[in-house]
Amino acid sequence: MTVHPDHYLIAAPVARLIEEFARLPGIGPKTASRLTFYLLRAEPKQAQALAQAILDVKAQVGYCRRCFNITVDELCPICRDPSRDQTKICVVEEPLDVLAIERTGAYRGLYHVLHGHIAPLEGIYREDLKIDELIARVRSEPVNEVILATNPNTEGEATAFLLLRDLAPLGVRVTRPARGLPTGGDLEWADPETLGSALEGRREL
C-alpha cells in the first residue's frame, strides 16, 4: 500500500511508518502522516515508550478462557468477581462493547465476547465467532438469561438471529436491549444513559 504518490520525496523509514499507521482502523493517510511527523518531533523517550507499550500489549494481554474478554490473567476480572450475577450472560461483539456496558453501571452479570459478527460478504461465518463456546457455557453454567447485545445494525441483527436459533433448544431466556439505540451504530459509541436504559428495558425474543 502506497500512501503518498510522491513517496520518493519521503525518507523510506518515514514512508514505512506512515503506511503502518494507515493500516490501523479509522486512520487515513492524512492522520497517519500527522502521527508520523509528530513522532519525528517528539523526544526519543516518548517514541520508545510508545513502542514499548505496543510490545507489552502484544506480549502480556490475551483473552479470558471463559468469556474471551481481554485479560492479563487466565480469567478476566469480571469472571473472577464472585459478586457478579452468574445466571446472566451478555453477548457482545467486541471487548470495547464490554467497556461501554460497564460504564453504564446498569448490568452486573457476566459477558461473552464473540470477536466479530456474521458478515458473509466479508468472509466471516459462524465458525469464525465464539458461538460454540457460548453454547457450551449455557449448557454447563447456571445461566437463565442470555442478553444478545450485538450492534443494532444489519450484521448485528443477523448475528442475534443466528444466536437465537442456536439458543432456543436450550430452554434459556433470550433477550435483546430495548429499541432506543441508534440504528446502524456500534454499542461503543452509545452514551451511557441510552445504553443503560436499553439494557434495563430489554425485551424477550
From Swiss-Prot:
Q: Where are the zinc fingers (C4-type)?
A: 64-79
Return one GO MF term: zinc ion binding
SMART domains assigned: TOPRIM
UniProt-listed PROSITE patterns: RECR, TOPRIM
Q: Which residues form the Toprim domain?
A: 87-182
Q: Which InterPro entries match?
A: DNA_Rcmb_RecR (IPR000093), Rcmb_RecR (IPR023627), Rcmb_RecR_Znf (IPR015967), TOPRIM_dom (IPR006171), TOPRIM_RecR (IPR034137)
Keyword set for this entry?
A: DNA damage, DNA recombination, DNA repair, Metal-binding, Zinc, Zinc-finger
**GO BP terms in the entry:** DNA recombination; DNA repair
UniProt entry tagged with the keyword Zinc-finger:
yes
NCBIfam families xrefs: recR
Protein family (similarity comment): Belongs to the RecR family.
The protein's job, in short, is: May play a role in DNA repair. It seems to be involved in an RecBC-independent recombinational process of DNA repair. It may act with RecF and RecO.
Query: Mind telling me what this protein is named?
Result: Recombination protein RecR
In the UniProt record, what gene is named as encoding this protein? recR
